[in-house]
Amino acid sequence: MKMRSLLSLSIAGLLSAPVYATTVTGKVTDTAGQPIAGAEVKIEGSRRVAYTDANGIYRFDDVKQPHIHLHVYSSNYIHGDNDLGDVNTGQNVDFVLKPASVENIVVTANALQSSVLESVTPVTVIGAEKLHKIEAPTLGETLKNAPGVHSTYFGPVSSSPVIRGNDGPRVKIVQNGLDVSDVSRVGPDHNVATTLSSATQVEVLRGPATLQYGSGAIGGVVNVVDKRIPQYQLDGVEGEAETSYSTVNNGSYTRADVTGGSGNIVWHVDGFYRDTDNADIPGFASIDPDEDEPNGVLESSAMETRNVVAGLSYVAEEGYFGFAVEQLDNKYGVPGHSHAHGEEEHEGEDHDLEEHDHEEHAEEGVLLDVDMTRYQAAGEWHSPFEGITNLKFAAAYTDYEHAEIEDGEPGTVFTNESSDIRLSAYHEEVNGWHGVFGLQFNHSDYNAVGEEAFTPANTTSSYALYLI
């Protein structure tokens, strides 16, 4: 009877333990005392985020975390933070941010997610605003003017990034930190199967920072970041749309991006459609043109691309978990890409770019028909247990196929089925040091069938542990 009474008192004591809900507010200004509008304020170890208004004011209500560490980000200012420690009363915390000489963006490909100015390794980040201004049909053409980056130019619709003179498998392409899992590293005229229409930023890593993505990426890593899996709560609907037209190839481009939510459920949908004819050029494409080559047209440079992405997340203060699916259909030509066929001659043939109403003469060149389906999941759990501040999970499964079509028939077919899983744990501060450790698993089943199947079929599995 006595033990039962003690147990009842203990349970009652636990249930009646106070749960503090505090309010955190403050003002963000620059060194001249002027308010900074639109600055992003985050509570570390939480999915809570607030943005400053026109007067630089931010506010968090009903904060239940006992330990509060605030971070402030603004693209034109140096990152600010303030560790308040354990608090149980309302807090008023002001920030004064120093201006940055360059746009200051958080690098998500970096394990510790430091900003550009705080990063000790070479990194280039292109933000959403600039990205939409320079966006080209391919990743290689989009990044070709970034420092140390060039393009394996095979026409306006076929190229891949070259970093510090390295391409192919020496340059790794990832989408939201996971391998894009196409076959662009196999051939320089194979496009990267990642899209930029809804990307929030593109990050180019060089040097030791690339080791967290494997030992083979000695040239660099390109990380395309988008918001297909929502990570923060949103009440209502927001989005944007764009359409454009180019005269050089009668090209049309339309994209839309919509995100909405209610309570803990947040969804996202985006997509685009691009359709171009062969590009107009001055004169002939060849140095020594034959009599059948047309003047003023770059043959086999047309493109038709469709892409749709849909994602859904459950977002709470303790973390989030979401899932997304993507479907990419891309048909594009490779100018001047001809193959020997014994004594056969292919002259004066017309190639139809799959339901295009415009016929283009193409003595040389092939059409690449890409079909890719990608499933991706991601999640984050704040303060899961003692000693760990964050636990992150990301996984992707990709089913990729592309056929190189010549004379209306598939010549070589490349396929790749790939799975990529990454788990990261961030430990609490130890003597002023922050760190992360984790593991990654990748499985790839690659095959190529046809006259240009220059690499044998192979199945690869890799496991890795890392500590930073």
How should these model regions be labeled?
Residues 301, 320-391, 397-418, 450-459:
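Flexible loop and strand-edge segments within Gram-negative outer membrane beta-barrel domains
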Residues 43-45, 71-83, 282:
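A short, solvent-exposed loop/turn motif at the edges and junctions
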Residues 47-57:
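Short, acidic Ser/Thr/Gly-rich low-complexity loop/linker segments typical of extracellular
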Residues 131, 143, 202-203, 222-224, ...:
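Non-catalytic regulatory/gating segments with a bias toward low-complexity or hydrophobic composition
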Residues 123, 140-182:
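Extracytoplasmic beta-strand/coil segments of soluble accessory domains associated
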Residues 73-77, 87-132, 140, 168:
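Short, acidic, small-residue-rich periplasmic hinge/interaction motif at the N-terminus
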Residues 179-206:
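Short acidic/polar hinge/loop motifs at secondary-structure boundaries
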Residues 239-242, 253, 257-368:
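Periplasmic-side early beta-strands and strand-to-turn transitions of outer-membrane beta-barrels
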